[in-house]
Amino acid sequence: MNPKNIKMSAGILALNRIKKQQLKEIPDKLKPENIHDAYKIQEQMHNIFQEINFGKRIGYKIGCTSSVMRKYLDINEPCYGGILNTGTNYISANKNFQDFSMPGVEIEIAVFVNEDFKFSNETTIDEIPLDKLTLFPAIELVDNRWIDYKIIDKNSLIADDFFASEIILGNPLPSHKINNLDNLTGKLIINEDQVSEGNTKNIMKHPI
């Protein structure tokens, strides 16, 4: 895609998000042609958000890390989207349904990296300095900004931050104080009723 179309596509997605609307699809001539275009559009959208003080990207969420979600969305690999400072909450948050297009809730683990690292595609879990990481129990507030996301192509989903919206972080804990990080169970309870349960071993065998 040429830079002009990337900016136009990012502008459409940014405006749709700001207005809390649902989009049928990105116009054909502005759709990302591949995953590289998708992330370029996403990056441009983040630039727009920062320019208009809607929010600054401070991190990333990784979606479709479980085989269940990849099968559900018919996607072969994990995808990432931006986390904005204006969408980052600590310990608790009061939110109105009307502040989203079609919100959902997911239990997550958030990771704060205390210093910069360089990894290759061949990096193994044993090479990651866990003592340099701080972990948070987290709740992700996802938002479906599509009229029918099931017919939206993967690249368009990525360009739009892959359902990213907000995150609520719990109390931090150094990773070396957590035993069996690859076998932790998380439960989602709403009004005293458990509605979901997951295990970190399902996150590509290890959450880190």
Regions found by a protein language model. Give the residues of each.
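Catalytic-core "active-site belt" of small-molecule-metabolizing enzymes
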Residues: N2-H206
